[in-house]
Amino acid sequence: MRILVTGGAGFIGSNFVHYVLEEHDDDEVITLDALTYAGSKDNLDGVRDNPRHEFVEGDIRNRDLVTKLVSDVDAIVNFAAESHVDQSIEGAKPFVTTNVQGTQILLEAANEGNIDRFLQISTDEVYGQILDGKFSEDDPLDPRNPYAATKAGADLLAQSFETTHDLPVLITRTCNNFGPRQHPEKLIPKFIRNAAVGENLPVYGDGSNVREWIYVEDNCRALDVVLREGAVGEMYNIGSHTEKTNLEVTEAILDAVGADEDLIEFVDDRAGHDQRYALETEKIEALGWEPVYAFEEGLERTVDYYLN
């Protein structure tokens, strides 16, 4: 399979590129990335010289470039996105142009080409918050911040191309990822580094917000399964069933680094901060996937990565 991976120099995208090239000897990967704040060529160290890998620096909003690349692949996996929630609250425009309009350009190029699979990478945030129970793939979307709203818009656009153009679209919605190659502004890498140098760890509100956490390698395995075995037109939740409050995650990081809990600093909560996300995962588990890494093991690996 020849795969175009957009946003492939970012956190999850680069881990996916590494995973595919390591697990599938016959696959070829073209990585397209604009190398904005979250993308780095360093994330592709170890695969950049692989003869089955090609890196292209460019933007998914560049229609001519996208059309050219799509004409020569079997599948598209679209990770390309602006994903920093706080920045989306400060200014939504780049989130709309990349996450929605960029996806539109990819979909139109795919529809003009001969694509076997179009995997749209989404997020559990499109569902909004849930105080009890878990979200299924059939639940309505209720995004509560500009980032989530643009991802929901991209999902609906992708679904519409499957319905109206018979484009072979699949959508995944994943819980919070952590692991190697994540941007240092994100919670876990930021807190690991702060704890290591004795700086405060700013926790929103009282730290009671709950997230479901999955180690990035487990997520990459799930994405690979959906790409190859998922049913066209379907959405797949990807979760770990490991829920932790932000305060629990913070305390686990301090313990793993060997730092004192006095470094915890409670700060004003952010606007639109959803209380809890949780996902039902029966559909992806029916494809034979399940997470391998416990949170504690994944965190140990993550701490080792950032400190060494």
Predicted regions and their residues:
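N-terminal Rossmann-like NAD(P)+-binding domain of SDR-like oxidoreductases, especially those catalyzing
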Residues: 1-177
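C-terminal substrate-binding subdomain of Rossmann-fold SDR/epimerase-dehydratase oxidoreductases
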Residues: 16, 39, 58, 195-308
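A structural alpha-helix within SAM-dependent methyltransferase catalytic domains
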Residues: 21, 70, 107, 111, ...
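Short aromatic-enriched loop/helix-cap "lid" or pocket-rim segments at secondary-structure transitions
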Residues: 41-44, 131-133, 182-185, 249-250, ...
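A glycine/serine/threonine-rich, flexible loop-to-helix segment
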Residues: 47, 133, 184-192, 253, ...
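Residues in well-ordered alpha-helical elements
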Residues: 64-67, 86, 93, 104, ...
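Proline-centered turn/helix-capping motifs that create local helix->coil transitions or kinks
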Residues: 116-119, 128-131, 166, 182, ...
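The catalytic Tyr-centered alpha-helix of NAD(P)H-dependent dehydrogenases
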Residues: 132, 143-150, 180, 184-188, ...
